[in-house]
Amino acid sequence: MPQNPSDRRPAPRDNPGTNAYEPLLSAEVRAALSTGLPVVALESTIIAHGLPRPRNLSVARELEGLVRSAGAVPATVAVLDGRARIGLDGDQLERVAGDPAVRKLGHRDLAPALAAGADGATTVSATAFLAARAGIGVFATGGLGGVHREWAENQDESADLRLLARTGITVVCAGVKSILDVPATLQRLETLGVPVVGYGTGHFPGFYLSSSGEPVDWTVHSPEEVAEVIRAREALGGPVGALIVANPVAERDQLDPVLHDRVLAQALDACRERGISGQGVTPFLLDQLTRRTEGASLEANLAAVRGNVTLAARIAVAAADAR
């Protein structure tokens, strides 16, 4: 009987030592960091698991191109052959985009994946951890994980939140997906001491939507202002943690709010009718949102990611110039 691809055993390592598990930086990323050039980390889960093939590869290349156009160096993060890689070449990017056996890796999965010689695409928690460890100060993603609906019954919360509370990196995102419990997520970030600033907005974005309706305490209006916040945090010292820059998708690119609210209400009703609960809720809601909006939610997702990547690169450039 054929094996599950995720169960395949890799060839044993030759004399594996501590260095065998050190993240491997591409020559371009290493040179940029050593000379103080701006670098932006990018996650790979959106490439391997978030988009249909072959569009995922073209989007991956597009996002790296947006970083370069803004004057920074892209560092897409992934695990290949049991080695964390920060900065991928063209062949490696194609491998992540084209191999269905590439696993989804959060921070907790990194050590087992490295030891097993596995291939994996990194989520927000894994990417933020590896990027910060390499000395990269800015990371762009679509949206953060957060507190899930029905938290009181199942205590389902993304690992992103705790990891960001102890990882020194600036994360540019479009908030959290509106299928999550947005007020509870913001409360959790406050409890964990993670600052959130709205970029050009007084409200926390709703990922597919420009606004979730929830206010933010601080607003910045330029990459230079964000760079100044980064400098102030570094000068203050104290506990290490992330800075969240919440960048709303442009109103012209957001999912139609009326359509969003109607589809989400229908999907929540379907959840209750089918008895779906716990960890099954979020994947079900995401699938329903994609299907019932006929792909419009995916386009809003991509618009948000593009905006975040461009802004992250501009912030990285401003932070490098301020040093």
Curated annotation (Swiss-Prot):
Alphabetized UniProt keyword annotations: Glycosidase, Hydrolase, Lyase, Manganese, Metal-binding
Gene Ontology biological-process entries: nucleobase catabolic process
GO cellular component: cytoplasm
EC number(s) given by UniProt: 4.2.1.70
Assembly and oligomerization: Homotrimer.
UniProt function note: Catalyzes the reversible cleavage of pseudouridine 5'-phosphate (PsiMP) to ribose 5-phosphate and uracil. Functions biologically in the cleavage direction, as part of a pseudouridine degradation pathway.
PANTHER family named in the record: CARBOHYDRATE KINASE PFKB DOMAIN-CONTAINING PROTEIN (PTHR42909:SF1), ZGC:136858 (PTHR42909)
Family, per entry: Belongs to the pseudouridine-5'-phosphate glycosidase family.
Protein name as catalogued: Pseudouridine-5'-phosphate glycosidase
Organism (species): Streptomyces griseus subsp. griseus (strain JCM 4626 / CBS 651.72 / NBRC 13350 / KCC S-0626 / ISP 5235)
